[in-house]
Amino acid sequence: MNDSEFHQLADELMLQLEETLDRFEGDADIDYETNGGVMTLSFENGSKIVINRQEPLHQIWLATKAGGYHFNRQETRWICDRSGEDFITLLSSACSTQAGETVRFE
């Protein structure tokens, strides 16, 4: 993948996350801010999740209360380079834990 393809895929992912958060109808208040390719999710309990793109490595990084994860694009999904888990699955789990209710990204 070249830099242009990486940016397009990363932009699509960020847009998907923003659209999901904008439609979220749960009780938890989840705010997000995107600045310079970094998305920060803020939860009522003061915790945060940070998602950013690492252009030189063509990776998406995810930082949660539970730890940090690095994702590489494999076919149609972003896959963790340590656990093999899908980005959307890990993000949904982390958001659900930090929000105190089920949050699903699809």
From Swiss-Prot:
Source organism: Pectobacterium carotovorum subsp. carotovorum (strain PC1)
Matching SUPFAM superfamilies: Frataxin/Nqo15-like
InterPro entries: CyaY, Frataxin/CyaY, Frataxin/CyaY_sf, Frataxin_CS
Alphabetical list of NCBIfam families matching this protein: FeS_CyaY (TIGR03421)
Keyword terms: Iron, Metal-binding
Protein function: Involved in iron-sulfur (Fe-S) cluster assembly. May act as a regulator of Fe-S biogenesis.
One function term, GO molecular function aspect: ferrous iron binding
PROSITE patterns reported for this sequence: FRATAXIN_1, FRATAXIN_2
Family note: Belongs to the frataxin family.
Annotated GO biological process: iron-sulfur cluster assembly
Keyword Ligase: no
HAMAP family (alphabetical): CyaY
Name of the protein in its database record: Iron-sulfur cluster assembly protein CyaY
Gene Ontology CC, one term: cytosol
